[in-house]
């Protein structure tokens, strides 16, 4: 597995927490927000499925590698514990497609409601307050466009599993990273060499563009609308969304109307777009949160943001950020 580049070993206490039922649930929640159930070529050609569990354990491993602090590493492990089925699709369902944070509100409750996890925290000398919010630990998480363990992990994970970046290249990137002080004198993951930062940012920008592509935005809104209809038809509840994807899919398939809608969703192979909404066709005009990374890199003048030392990346990142999504998007089917 690509994640073994992050650290040679993890604390047994942390590994035990990863084995609890509340964490094992994340094996059945994907990283790609339901889009992987379509027949988009990018998912059809993926190396392997990418689960929230893999990402969570990888994030914990990165935090451990750079801090060797159990509290911070466990917070990294648990940061996605409240992720619902289809992940950020539920943010679209909640009207939070621009911030995509609405599902995080259950994090503390999900931890506290797991007797196995709470017992392991107590045994490790940790409290709920220590681990319920990884935002307080800057190596684990920080504000975009800074680089954190969370952003680093899903960028490398997608680079390998979706973009077919060799594991050796991931290791080359990871081994170049160190902890430095940013503009606010706060710890941040940084690159030692500009040429490695260049490789990483090309992967990161490709990912950023994909995360807000017409295909991604359309699919997430379409699936959110399908879940909304399922709730209106009393086929599922909000709590059902916090189980796992096989459970939610089984509920959709229990209703003939929703079964047809789900089967149509699974046949989406691409999208079309235009200034006018096509008549008689399901179409959406929806914006989305733009995720991007502008890492710090070591230069002869100290640490600087990569956009200040690489004009090409600065130009491409600015172009990415300028898209206003002012177009209608609809599906192409297999």
PLM region spans:
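Short alpha-helical catalytic segment bearing the HExxH-like zincin motif
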Residues: 72-80
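Histidine-centered, transition-metal-coordinating active-site segments
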Residues: 1-71, 85, 89-334
């Amino acid at each position: 597995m690509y994640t073994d580049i992050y650290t040679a070993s993890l604390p047994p206490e942390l590994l035990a927490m990863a084995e609890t039922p509340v964490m094992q649930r994340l094996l059945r929640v994907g990283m790609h927000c339901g889009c992987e159930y379509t027949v988009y070529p990018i998912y059809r050609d993926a190396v392997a499925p990418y689960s929230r569990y893999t990402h969570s354990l990888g994030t914990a491993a990165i935090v451990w590698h750079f801090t060797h602090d159990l509290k911070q590493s466990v917070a990294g492990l648990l940061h996605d514990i409240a992720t619902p089925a289809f992940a950020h699709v539920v943010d679209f369902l909640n009207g939070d497609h621009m911030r995509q944070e609405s599902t995080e509100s259950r994090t503390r409750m999900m931890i506290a409601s797991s007797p196995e996890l709470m017992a392991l925290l107590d045994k490790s000398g940790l409290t709920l307050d220590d681990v319920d919010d990884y935002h307080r630990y800057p190596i684990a998480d920080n504000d975009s466009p800074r680089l954190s363990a969370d952003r680093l992990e899903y960028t490398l994970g997608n680079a390998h599993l979706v973009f077919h970046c060799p594991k050796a290249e991931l290791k080359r990137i990871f081994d170049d990273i160190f902890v430095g002080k940013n503009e606010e004198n706060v710890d941040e993951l940084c690159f030692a060499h500009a040429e490695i930062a260049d490789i990483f940012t090309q992967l990161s920008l490709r990912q950023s563009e994909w995360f807000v592509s017409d295909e991604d935005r359309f699919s997430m809104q379409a699936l959110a609308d399908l879940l909304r209809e399922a709730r209106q038809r009393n086929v599922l509840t909000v709590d059902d969304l916090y189980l796992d994807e096989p459970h939610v899919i089984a509920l959709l398939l229990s209703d003939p109307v929703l079964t047809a809608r789900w089967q149509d969703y699974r046949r989406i192979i691409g999208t079309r777009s235009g200034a006018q909404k096509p008549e008689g066709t399901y179409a959406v005009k929806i914006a989305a949160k733009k995720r991007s990374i502008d890492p710090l890199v070591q230069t002869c003048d100290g640490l600087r943001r990569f956009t200040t030392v690489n004009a090409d990346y600065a130009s491409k990142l600015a172009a990415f950020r300028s898209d206003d999504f002012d177009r209608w998007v609809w599906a192409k089917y297999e």
